[in-house]
């Protein structure tokens, strides 16, 4: 499986409810720019965090790339979710190309865990950055 990890674009400063933060104008442009680099990739599934900024990111990517994929919102892709629990959930997806839209520190921890680069440290991922793992 090719696993694509995409961190959401730049979001509004921290608010009372982290899950409700939205993308800034700059964040939206970051996402569109990143999506252009992914043009031509046929994603079998798109999984996304329930947080607003991640959902906005997934929607922008699908719109920019003119993907017909339905975005599947899953509750286990929040910033503090356990990487081992996430990998167990991912084992249930038998697809060739999967896009996950989420957050740090989860995505960086997932990249480190799956590559065995360093299971104790997170891989840095800036806003709207993407990593592809095979």
Predicted regions, residues:
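Active-site-proximal alpha-helix that buttresses catalytic centers in soluble enzyme cores
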Residues: 2-84, 107-108, 121, 125-128
């Amino acid at each position: 499986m090719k696993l694509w990890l995409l961190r959401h674009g730049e979001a509004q400063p921290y608010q009372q409810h982290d899950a409700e933060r939205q993308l800034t104008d700059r964040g939206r442009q970051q996402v569109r720019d990143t999506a252009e680099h992914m043009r031509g990739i046929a994603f079998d599934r798109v999984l996304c965090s329930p947080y607003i900024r991640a959902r906005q990111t997934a929607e922008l990517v699908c719109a920019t790339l003119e993907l017909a994929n339905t975005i599947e919102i899953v509750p286990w892709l929040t910033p503090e979710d356990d990487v081992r629990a996430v990998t167990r959930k991912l084992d249930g997806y038998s697809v060739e190309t999967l896009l996950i839209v989420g957050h740090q520190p989860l995505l960086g921890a997932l990249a480190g865990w799956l590559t065995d680069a360093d299971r104790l440290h997170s891989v840095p991922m800036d806003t709207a950055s993407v990593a592809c793992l095979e």
